[in-house]
Amino acid sequence: MALLQIAEPGQSSAPHQHRIAIGIDLGTTHSLVATVLSGKPKVLNDVQNRRLLPSIVHYGDNTTHYGEEAKPFIIADPKNTIVSVKRFMGRSKADIKFQHPYELVGSENEMPAFETRAGRKTPVEISAEILKQLKDRAEDSLQNPVNGAVITVPAYFDEAQRQATRDAAQLAGLNVLRLLNEPTAAAVAYGLDQESNLATDRNYVIYDLGGGTFDVSILRFSQGVFEVLATGGHTALGGDDLDRLIVKWAKKQLNIDVLSDEDYAVFIVAARQAKEQLSTQDSVELKLLEATLTLDRPTFESIIQVALDKTISVCKRVLRDAKLELTDIQNVVLVGGSTRSYAVQKAVREVFAQEPLCTINPDEVVAIGASITANQLIGNSQDGSLLLDVTPLSLGLETMGGLVERLISRNTAIPVARRQEFTTYQDGQTAMLIHVVQGERDLVEHCRSLGRFVLHGIPPMTAGQARIEVTFQVDADGLLTVSAREATSGVQAHIDIKPSYGLSEADTERLLIEGFQHAEEDKNLRHLKETKVEAERELESLEQALKVDADLLDEKQLDALNSAKESLKAQLEGSDIQAIEHAVQQLKVHSDAFAALRMNRHIDHALKGTKLDDWSKSN
């Protein structure tokens, strides 16, 4: 929906002035820019009439080459020619386990830099170079400055990867209106809200296999609203991986164990060409070094089957998440250049038992959707359709016992804000550590830590009296802000979650799949932890009370209370929930009597020196 803008008095722009907004598909293999002209989206060409900008940057001694001009250097100068930089965005050096020819510098737990002839370049800087090329292309083509841009990202990009994308856009001089999930952009491009039968809810699968990432989303269109019901994918699975599988096959055919960086670049280029040619041919020849190999369609299918199986597995899981059957899906939309492959189309057709939609160029569909959204956000369009993206993983914080309290569940539509009250655990507690985590498990140790901050200045109170309101807010770009505020004093603190690196493919898979596999185990373990926390709170309160009023008990009462206390402590060493609960009840038998004695003492102190007449006068 269009954002309303309020200008300063006397500074409002001319009525109905058209503002230039662009949509950018910042892809792993190729990038594009589009805009809406005369009500229709259009992909913008460069001066050579080319639409696709290869996402390649070559750093020479005195010159930097981009796109097609950088392509020849993939083989001639691979160490200084950066391709598929999107796969490095927001990821640590330790996370980057796939083969590449680059010299990476930096610590293991930080986003690395590439050592090039032009100096050290970070993935953010290189992405900014690509974005700047697209911005310049748009301004040259439209003969006007760009006022804003919508940039697409994979739905499975986490906070670190999204923030890295925003940083790159800022470095390129772009005003980012929004980061938009690529599958959502595809839905907009296909105008799925414009179909004739809109009386009933309609469900769509967006299958997006690009150069370096895979995403599948299930969208529902209902009463003018697009909602992403569920989403899943891999941050490191795409056409590049299909190329690598072909290279692996070729090495085996030629009995080659290790390739030099230069030879590897030759193999990758040949593999990519073969993959593309097999979309229209039954077989192709690969000229590799001094040998020639023939690759036919059945062999190609068997080579890439392991990757296709991964995508189909994700599709089935996302259907389960959305609580839908195959018969509930009206259309399947193919997005991403890799879906041109006949093998990919065949796999999708067989799983969903229908012909997928691929009438819009799969390389351009995301940029087209982004341009339509940008046109809406800048205020040029009156289209009232609403897009709701979702959080890919649950967000929560750590509570006593190392338990996770979820505030925002997985697949919640964004933007979203959730508030919940928490309290202190100990008497006189003046600070609280807020530990933010991401994942599907019930224990903090099984989730991913996103960040920590401390709320200071909590007034000293009895445990459980303080009221701390914690707010989780995820904006339309999927970026998270967590704030905490103490009610009586008004003290507050917050953190913007910008992790130093993103999730690896293995981490993403672990967080999701283990959540399903260990659901029952986690439920039982959570019950045990909660029972222990309550028992420990009882013991802590009793210890504090005994320090003050132990003289109220005679020797026999004190011995009985201490015996029950030690019995509970012994049970807390084990994991028998019923035994712990029984020990708590036995302790309460004695502690309740002690509490009654304490209450009487405090009432006596309060009434000491007070006459009956004083009560009569007060009433």
Swiss-Prot record:
| InterPro entries documented for this protein | ATPase_NBD, Heat_shock_70_CS, HscA_NBD, HSP70_C_sf, HSP70_peptide-bd_sf, Hsp_70_fam, ISC_FeS_clus_asmbl_HscA
Q: What Pfam families has UniProt attached to this entry? A: HSP70
CDD domains recorded for this chain?
A: ASKHA_NBD_HSP70_HscA
Name the Gene Ontology molecular function terms of this record.
Answer: ATP binding; ATP hydrolysis activity; ATP-dependent protein folding chaperone; unfolded protein binding
Q: Which UniProt keywords apply?
A: ATP-binding, Chaperone, Nucleotide-binding, Stress response
Family indicated by similarity: Belongs to the heat shock protein 70 family.
Quote the protein name from its UniProt record.
Answer: Chaperone protein HscA homolog
Which organism's genome codes for this protein? Acinetobacter baumannii (strain AYE)
